[in-house]
Amino acid sequence: MRTATVQRTTKETDIAITVNLDGTGDYSVSTGIGFLDHMVEQLSRHSLIDISMQVKGDLHIDQHHTVEDSALALGEAVAKALGDKRGIARYGEAHAPMDETLTRCVLDISGRPHCVYKSSFSQPRLGEMDTEMFPHWFHSFAQTAGITLHIETLYGENNHHIAESMYKALARALRQAVEIDPRKGDAIPSTKGVL
C-alpha cells in the first residue's frame, strides 16, 4: 500500500497527517477551522485517498499558519506516499460542477511544483475561513506535493459552491493521476527516467 505519515511541528503549528493513496476516501480531519475541515473531507472522499489530519495551530493569531502548514504537510505526505512514482498515470484532469458553479483542474505529478490559480470570491469569509487563504492553500499543496497544478473556476456565484467545486475538481484529478496504470508496469512515466 502507498501510505505515508508526516509530522510537522513548529512554534506555530503541530500537525500529524497520514494518507493512503489506495484508500476508499475515509477521513478524520480536525484543523480547528470548520470550513477547511469540510474541504479536506471533500478532497479525501472524492479522490478516494484516506486522509487523517490532526492540526493544532495558533488560531488565536489568525488562520494563516494553520492553513498554510496543513497544506504543506498534506502535499508532503502525498509526495512521500508516491515514492519514485513508478507506474502512476501521472496526469489528471477533471471538471467539477456544483449547481451553478463549474471548476476545472488539470495536474501533472511532474516533480516541478507550480500552481496557476484562477478563482475569486465575493465575500471575505466562508464560515470562519478567510477566503484569501484558498489560493495560498492550493499553492502550498502544489509546492510540497511536487505537482504542476492548474485550477480555474470557469463560472459560479455562490461562494461555498466555488470553494467546494475547487476541492472536488482537485480530488478527481488527483485520483486519476495517482492511479497505477497496469500497462506501465513499474516504469517511471517520463522519458527522462525520473520525476
UniProtKB/Swiss-Prot annotation:
Catalytic activity line of the entry: D-erythro-1-(imidazol-4-yl)glycerol 3-phosphate = 3-(imidazol-4-yl)-2-oxopropyl phosphate + H2O
Main subcellular localisation: cytoplasm
Statement: the UniProt record of this protein carries the keyword Cytoplasm: yes
The protein's annotated pathway: Amino-acid biosynthesis; L-histidine biosynthesis; L-histidine from 5-phospho-alpha-D-ribose 1-diphosphate: step 6/9
Listed GO biological process terms: L-histidine biosynthetic process
Record's GO cellular component terms: cytoplasm
Keyword Magnesium set for record: no
Pfam families: IGPD
Entry superkingdom: Bacteria
Keywords: Amino-acid biosynthesis, Cytoplasm, Histidine biosynthesis, Lyase
Family: Belongs to the imidazoleglycerol-phosphate dehydratase family.
Annotated HAMAP family: HisB
Protein name as catalogued: Imidazoleglycerol-phosphate dehydratase
Source species: Sphingopyxis alaskensis (strain DSM 13593 / LMG 18877 / RB2256)
